[in-house]
C-alpha cells in the first residue's frame, strides 16, 4: 500500500490495489493493468477511482484522476462518524460505528485507506461477505454517503437539532 502526497489542494492519495489482467485474442494474450485508488482531503471529502492501462503508472494516473473527479462530502463528528452505518455493494457489506477518542481506525485493508483519507480518526469497522477491494471501497463510500448529520435530519424533519438529539 503506497502513500503519495500531491500539492493539488493538499489531497491525500492512496493506492489500494494494482492487478494484472489479460485479454485473450487470436494471437495470444494481451496484458494490461488496473489500479484502485482513493483520494481525500482529510476533512470529510473522499473519492475513489479505478483506472486501466497497458502500463502501471498510466493506470495509477487514470485512477487518481477519476478519484479526484468523483469526490463526495462526508459529515464527520470530531474525527469519527455521526452514527453507526452500513454500506453494501454487490457481495460486500460493511458496518462502521463511531468510536471514542484514542481508539484509532480499526478496519481492514481497503476500508482503512478510505477512512484515513476521508479524515476519520476513530472508528470501529468490519467487512462481511466478499473482501474484493473494489467492492469493499464502494460499500464503504456507500455507507459514508448514507450517513446523516443531526443538522441534515433536523432540516428534513423541520425540527431543531436539540429535538433530534433529545436534549
From Swiss-Prot:
It comes from the Bacteria. GO terms for molecular function: rRNA binding; structural constituent of ribosome. GO terms for biological process: translation. Residues 11-74 form the S5 DRBM domain. Disulfide bonds: none annotated. NCBIfam families: rpsE_bact. Belongs to the universal ribosomal protein uS5 family. With S4 and S12 plays an important role in translational accuracy. The N-terminal domain interacts with the head of the 30S subunit; the C-terminal domain interacts with the body and contacts protein S4. The interaction surface between S4 and S5 is involved in control of translational fidelity. This is Small ribosomal subunit protein uS5. It comes from Klebsiella pneumoniae subsp. pneumoniae (strain ATCC 700721 / MGH 78578). The gene is rpsE.
